């Protein structure tokens, strides 16, 4: 056998071996893929779709929800009966073809199974999502219905508990309750007949009406309590109080109080009747108006009761206060009469006291009898209070005025006595000032000083003349005393100034002798100053002249002399 044939045989054997090996590899790979698809199929088939379907089925769906559930349930049945069986057949075919090394057909079957599994997986996902939505939707609807029913049950319970607190609104509330019950029945009917949209709308309305009626029933008892309990009780209290006040001789400016009571009762009845419409805002507003009218009646009675207490107090004060004012005025008149014998009094004071007397008489005429027979008057105590307070203010003003007049006249005699003492003192001081000037032995007295001296003397004489009159004008005395006091003080200061200027000038003139022989300016000022000093008696001008000249040649000399003088200056000994 030739070598070529041997090589060919070897090559063929090798090809067969290689082909077999490749076939084995492909077969193993296909086995692996078929196994994976089998696992996937088992996984999909093992999903808890049946359990989820049973859960939704137990919800007892109705209407559109039930129809939708049936469609998805049927789809799952189709998948389990048809799709999974078909997939199982194709897997079997794929295994058979793979085992017989028919890899092309095996591959075709594998691809077919994979596509079917993808579709089944998508369908199962859709079914589960739909079931979840149906379950969630039904749970929401159930919770919503439960919530609405709970609200209604609470409303029923609340209405039953407060049955006696609704007054005239009870029939209307019962009517509204029946309407809500009808709406719930309508909801059940529509929901069962497969009209979920309209059923939902009806449920919404039923819930809204339940909430609204619940809010109304919560507010009604407070309104009814006012109309049936509080207002009638307050009105009964007012009427009984009014009768007691009339028995106690109270009077009122208003003459229609009984009519007002009737009007308030009618307003209460009217508001209670109209409350049946459940217009709570209007009812509350009307209640506020009724309460305001009742409060006004209370305020009226309380005002009169308070006025009675105040007037009773005033009625006790007025007689004694009036006597006090009369006594004060009599004493004031007596004192003014006594003082008028010796003094000229202010005419305004006399007329003021007469005015007090007139006011006291008016009070006595207008009020005294009212105060004494306080409880026997047929006018409201509030009006009596106004009258009493007005006249008490008058008496208070009279008393204040009396005190002012008394203060103005009580010290007249003391003023006179003090004025006489001061006048004597001023005369003595005038003589002492004159003696003080004489002892200075001045060349002469300045005319200005003489004018001040004689003016002061004249003012003292005027004061003495006024004090010596038969009837003393005390106002004039006070004025002249003040003038005399100021004049004496001014004369004393002027005296010290004249003496100081004269003394210092004389000392400086003597001191200037040091410079006269060689300072022409000092000599000239010396001559001028001597003329002013000895001839014109102008000591101030003389001092200014010589001090200025000396300051030019010896600065500070004037201050030295002034300081020395002030330390040793002699004072007038009064």
From Swiss-Prot:
Task: Name the Pfam families for this protein.
Answer: EzrA
Q: Which residues cross the membrane?
A: 8-26
Taking the record's annotation, the residue ranges forming a coiled coil are: 102-140, 243-379, 459-520
Provide the alphabetized UniProt keywords: Cell cycle, Cell division, Cell membrane, Coiled coil, Membrane, Septation, Transmembrane, Transmembrane helix
**InterPro entries documented for this protein:** EzrA
The record gives the membrane topology as:
Single-pass membrane protein
Cellular component terms (Gene Ontology)? plasma membrane; septin ring
Gene Ontology biological-process entries: division septum assembly; septin ring assembly
Protein's UniProt keywords contain Transmembrane helix = yes
* Extracellular-side positions: 1-7
On whether Coiled coil is a keyword of this UniProt record, the answer is yes
Which parts of the chain does the record assign to the membrane side Cytoplasmic? 27-574
Subcellular location per UniProt equals: Cell membrane
Q: Which NCBIfam families match?
A: PRK04778.1-1, PRK04778.1-4
The family assignment reads: Belongs to the EzrA family.
Functionally, this protein is described as follows: Negative regulator of FtsZ ring formation; modulates the frequency and position of FtsZ ring formation. Inhibits FtsZ ring formation at polar sites. Interacts either with FtsZ or with one of its binding partners to promote depolymerization.
What this protein is called in its record is Septation ring formation regulator EzrA
Species whose genome carries this gene: Streptococcus uberis (strain ATCC BAA-854 / 0140J)
Q: Its encoding gene is what?
A: ezrA
């Amino acid at each position: 056998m030739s070598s070529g044939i041997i090589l060919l045989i070897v090559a063929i054997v090798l090809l067969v071996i290689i082909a077999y090996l490749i076939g084995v590899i492909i077969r193993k790979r296909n086995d692996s893929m078929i196994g994976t698809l089998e696992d996937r199929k088992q996984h999909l088939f093992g999903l808890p779709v049946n359990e989820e379907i049973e859960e939704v089925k137990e919800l007892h769906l109705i209407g559109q929800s039930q129809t939708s559930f049936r469609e998805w349930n049927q789809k799952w049945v189709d998948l389990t009966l048809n799709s999974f069986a078909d997939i199982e057949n194709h897997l079997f075919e794929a295994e058979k073809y793979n085992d017989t090394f028919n890899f092309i057909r095996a591959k075709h079957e594998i691809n077919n199974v994979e596509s079917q599994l993808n579709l089944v997986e998508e369908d199962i996902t859709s079914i589960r999502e739909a079931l979840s939505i149906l379950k969630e939707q039904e749970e929401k609807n159930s919770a919503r219905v439960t919530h609405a029913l709970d609200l209604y049950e609470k409303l029923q319970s609340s209405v039953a508990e407060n049955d006696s607190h609704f007054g005239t609104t009870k029939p209307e509330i019962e009517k509204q309750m029946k309407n809500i019950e009808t709406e719930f029945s309508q909801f059940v009917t529509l929901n069962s007949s497969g009209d979920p949209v309209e059923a939902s709308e009806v449920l919404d309305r039923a819930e809204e009406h339940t909430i609204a009626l619940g809010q109304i029933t919560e507010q009604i008892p407070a309104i009814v309590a006012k109309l049936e309990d509080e207002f009638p009780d307050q009105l009964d209290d007012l009427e009984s109080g009014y009768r007691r006040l009339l028995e106690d001789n109270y009077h009122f400016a208003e003459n229609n109080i009984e009519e007002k009571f009737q009007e308030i009762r009618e307003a209460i009845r009217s508001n209670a009747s109209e409350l049946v419409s459940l217009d709570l805002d209007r009812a509350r507003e009307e209640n506020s108006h009724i309460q305001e009218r009742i409060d006004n009646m209370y305020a009226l009675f309380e005002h009169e009761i308070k006025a009675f207490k105040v007037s009773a107090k005033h009625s006790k004060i007025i007689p004694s206060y009036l006597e006090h004012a009369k006594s004060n005025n009599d004493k004031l008149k007596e004192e003014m009469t006594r003082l008028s014998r010796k003094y000229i009094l202010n005419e305004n004071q006399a007329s003021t006291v007469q005015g007090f007397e007139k006011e006291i008489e008016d009070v006595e005429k207008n009020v005294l009898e009212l105060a004494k027979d306080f409880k026997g008057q047929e006018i409201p105590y509030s009006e009596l209070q106004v009258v009493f307070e007005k006249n008490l203010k008058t008496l208070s003003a009279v008393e204040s005025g009396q005190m002012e007049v008394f203060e103005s006249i009580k010290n007249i005699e003391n003023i006179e006595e003090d004025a006489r003492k001061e006048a004597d003192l001023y005369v003595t001081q005038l003589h002492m000032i004159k003696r003080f000037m004489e002892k200075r032995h001045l060349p002469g007295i300045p005319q200005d000083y003489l004018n001040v001296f004689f003016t002061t003397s004249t003012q003292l004489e005027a004061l003495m003349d006024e004090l010596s009159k038969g009837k003393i004008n005390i106002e004039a005395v006070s004025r002249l005393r003040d003038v005399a006091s100021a004049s004496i003080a001014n004369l004393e200061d002027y005296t010290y100034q004249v003496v100081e200027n004269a003394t210092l000038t004389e000392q400086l003139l003597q001191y200037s002798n040091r410079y006269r022989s060689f300072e022409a300016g000092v000599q000239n000022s010396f001559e001028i100053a001597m003329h002013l000093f000895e001839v014109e008696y102008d000591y101030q001008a003389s001092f200014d002249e010589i001090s200025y000249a000396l300051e030019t040649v010896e600065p500070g000399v004037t201050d030295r002399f002034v300081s020395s003088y002030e330390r040793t200056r002699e004072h007038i000994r009064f």
